[in-house]
A protein has these predicted regions:
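Active-site loop-to-helix "anion-binding N-cap" substructures in soluble metabolic enzymes
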Residues: 1-200
């Protein structure tokens, strides 16, 4: 029943846990969190930067991500990728999301069944070998896995153009999700017209 505790009591509990685990515990705080939450974070930043920070920490054995689902999933993916597991002798780093109800409307714009349906429908009229799927980092791990299975790429807002250039060097078409606006605006900036960007 932590929800019934006052902030001072919560802070004391968190500090006790931090003292117990020392540098093995990394607490990440996303920019959007309240000041009281950020004050207890070891690192503050955007979702990708925070995930990279935790994954590169040689002492880290536990991650608490004070953010939303896709952020914790991204930290899990980066911290537990094969080369990191090998460095730690196969030991996985658990990632804790303190508020399991913390979601992101952007990440919720596309569910895996919708992406698979769209891909199948595209396959009825096009050769999907000529389509590179690109997902924005603000997406569920299942969408990132889909992209990986189909030879695609995960992008951030700062490297979306580079991701599209990489994709178009491989195939003549791109399937971009879940943020249609990031995809369209980036493509427009590359000289691709709106009539060349159908929406599903």
């Amino acid at each position: 029943p932590y929800k019934s505790l006052e902030n001072d009591a919560l802070t004391a509990r968190i500090q006790a846990v931090r003292k117990h685990f020392g540098p093995q515990l990394v607490i990440l705080g996303h920019h959007y969190q309240q000041d009281e939450v950020i004050a207890l974070a070891d690192c503050r930043g955007d979702s990708y930067g925070l995930s990279q920070h935790a994954a590169e920490s040689s002492n880290c054995r536990f991650i608490v991500f004070r953010g939303v689902h896709f952020m914790a999933e991204t930290a899990d993916i980066l911290a537990n990728r094969p080369e990191k597991l090998a460095e730690r002798g196969g030991v996985r780093i658990p990632v804790v999301l303190p508020d399991l109800a913390a979601g992101c409307s952007m990440a919720d714009m596309a569910a895996i069944h919708q992406i698979e349906d769209a891909w199948d429908q595209l396959g009825e009229i096009l050769d999907t070998e000529d389509i590179t799927p690109v997902t924005y980092i603000n997406s569920a791990a299942s969408l990132k896995a889909f992209v990986g299975r189909h030879g695609g790429i995960v992008c951030t807002s700062s490297n979306a153009k580079a991701a599209l250039e990489w994709s178009f060097a491989r195939t003549s078409r791109v399937m971009f999700f879940p943020d249609q606006h990031l995809g369209r605006n980036t493509a427009l900036g590359m000289g691709i017209t709106l009539d060349e960007m159908p929406l599903w």
